[in-house]
Amino acid sequence: TPANVADFSATAYFFASYLRKVLNVPVGVICSSWGGSKIESWINKEVYTEKFPEISLSVLTKDPKDIARPKDEPTLLYNAMIHPIKQFTIKGTIWYQGESNLNNPQVYKRLFPAMVRSWRKEWNQGEFPFYYVQIAPYDYGRKNADKTEAAEIRQVQLECLKEIPNAGMVVTADIGNRTCVHPSDKESVGKRLALWALAKTYQRSGTPYSGPLYKSFTIDKEKIIVEFDYAEMGMTSYDREIVGFEIAGKDGIYYPAKAVLFDNKTKVTLTSDQVPEPVGVCLLY
């Protein structure tokens, strides 16, 4: 209602609102969230004991008043905000997190699938849908920090799409705000999550639910040809120059590439005068 929606997750609200509009049935959403939290805090004790014994659980023996940032500590948000809602039957989960784990993407790559498996085990409803959001563009650079951290987390989130069964990922590269870690366009994020649910959970055929995702590339003399999943209907740049692609030769130095759509706009060909014999490609990395 207007009286209580202001304190609710905007992304979750727009997700449920779009589902209700399309399905024409009430859609209930439980919001369990804490801004700026680390994934470690959303994982239960058993996962750490069995799979990650190297991660300390000493926080569990501390006096609560001595814990300055519970959202950073292993198990605490799981204990307080996930375990109590296990009694509810759910259709699926949406997840928007990752910004606070920039410092160690490879650990995130292990923890994220482990968390999803543990939640599914807790609910005992099989591999229920798990749709998540790739972190948005923002100048995450911190003092003495590696400027590639955000790109590495996004890459890990993309790779987790293959590690987590019955999962979907929403890309936000086009709707972020480089100067604000909380981009205002939550409606697009919620709708994109809803499209995954409509297509894969509610089996609404014909629903386009994902933007193009990198599949593979091949080398053709001076060109690199990039193929994508979810591009069967063709891609578009809306008559604007395609920017962000770079290619490199054997020296490993990347240069901006000219990108052209072809093959019914399902593939991209890349060239650069500075790279006559390309061997590698990257996009916005």
Where are these predicted regions, by residue range?
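Cell-envelope and extracellular/periplasmic
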Residues: 1-285
